[in-house]
Amino acid sequence: MIVLRRKHVLSARQEQRMLPYGGKIEMSFEFIRKLPTPEEIRRDYAVPEHIARLKEERDREIRDVFTGKSNKFLVIIGPCSADNEDAVCDYVSRLARVNEKVKDRLILIPRVYTNKPRTTGDGYKGLVHQPDPEKNPDFLQGLIAMRKMHIHTVEESGLTCADEMLYPENWRYVSDILSYVAIGARSVEDQQHRLAASGFDVPAGMKNPTSGDFSVMLNSVYAAQHPHSFIYRGWEVNTTGNDLAHTVLRGATNKHGRNLPNYHYEDLNLLLTLYNERELKNPACIIDANHSNSDKQHKQQIRIVKEVMHSRKLNPD
């Protein structure tokens, strides 16, 4: 049970006064309540000092991989979505033991995705929407649950995590605890996602869209690597650009609904050529061994990873 501090509890009259248009339905929007700012949530659920130091160390180690200073591989690993904190903490604690065996060659980043994009908009949308899948959506409790889960997973494992930024405005609720952010296949063409990613201070993986178009993905990387001015959470902001924005190949879906992989040698060679045609910093690619690449057959992932590693031997670039 989560007990909110007093400042989060408003009377019905106070909430009514804070709502746009006096709480009336306007243009089919019903404004329910004002949510706490990221600063308020971060103050109430602060990152412990030792975790903050750990994140700095992990971020530096991960950056060295993207900039070419380190020969280690990044492995972002975990379930499709994270909705049960106990189960997630149990998983990352076991992953930490694996990390001890491979840390001289690999950097393991637990995949703790608290938002779940839906193809049609229907279905469970993740922890932020419904911290309790058996109850109605509660975004206040969802934001708190998201932050607490990320803090607790690091405390449990010593491994800072990755999350998908389905909603760019949620970034600052967890920007002091995450070490990697993914922009999904359905979001990568969206301008707000691209511009927000240009202000992230951790690597941002820009997935190819569901169509599989490499140019869309690379345009997204270009946008994220450059500075921008835009509106963000009610503020006029400037960003400096994210030099760690990179590509993620996750397979595609054709017009007949058939999944098409894009992890083969020919795909990687094409991506390398396209990278060389553009002035992008720290060219890098992460292969998503699931989704359309595996046709969602999880047992295929081991074979896919082995093939990708073999492809690297065929071309030193």
Residue ranges and their predicted role:
Residues E49-R63, S70, C80-V92, N99-I109, ...:
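Metallocofactor- and cofactor-centric catalytic cores in central/energy metabolism, strongly enriched
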Residues S70-F73, V102-L106, S157-L159, V202, ...:
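Short, well-ordered coil/turn segments that N-cap beta-strands
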